Amino acid sequence: MKKNIARILLYIICAVLVVFYIMVLWWGKNPKVGIEYRMYYLTHELTDWPGYGNLKYKYGTKEICTEYKDRNGNELHNVCSRKGQGWQKSKRYEGTKNTAKDSYIYYIPEESSDEIYLVCDITEYNTESSDGKDIEVYVNDKLIGNIDNKGVTKLKIGNVSADELLTVRFHADYAEYTLYSISLDKA
């Protein structure tokens, strides 16, 4: 009788361990993490760690695309930490240069709006090797316009829903440019 009880307990313990092991594998494959964590650590879409909740965006907030400290070591505020792949990763004191054909920036707006504009300040723009082609700007794979020179450019995005991930993609086949600041503004 004691052998049967010992066997039954052993089978129960083994079953519990198997179930626990399967749960651990499931949690490893499908973690419940924030979108910032997923995009930075799991899919590697973000180049800078924005912190939890920092992809959220309030319209009209102008962010500069530089390092967190200037050349003298002074802290800077409103630094764009939502940049994805395709951007320079260090020594970004005068803005951030593109390093690939496609460069990404991500937003999660806090509120919905019918008329939103993307405002970009390009400080350097070189099209010598691009056959004169402009920078094409896409939001969620929809072309919203072109940037054809340095300076401030305002492009209409249109309707934006709250808590929806906006993927801004700058496509430049061979153009080199430096993005100094960026914002989403209401009309």
Predicted regions: what they are:
Residues L10, V18-S113, D121-G132, H171-A187:
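Glycan-recognition and processing domains
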Residues E128-L143:
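Short, surface-exposed beta-strand/strand-loop-strand elements in extracellular ectodomains
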Residues E164-A172:
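Short, aromatic- and glycine-rich surface loops/edge beta-strands on solvent-exposed regions
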Residues S113-E115, D163-L165:
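Extracellular Ig-like/FN3 beta-sandwich strand-entry sites
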Residues M1-V18:
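N-terminal Sec-pathway targeting helices
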Residues V139-A162:
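Extracellular carbohydrate recognition and processing domains
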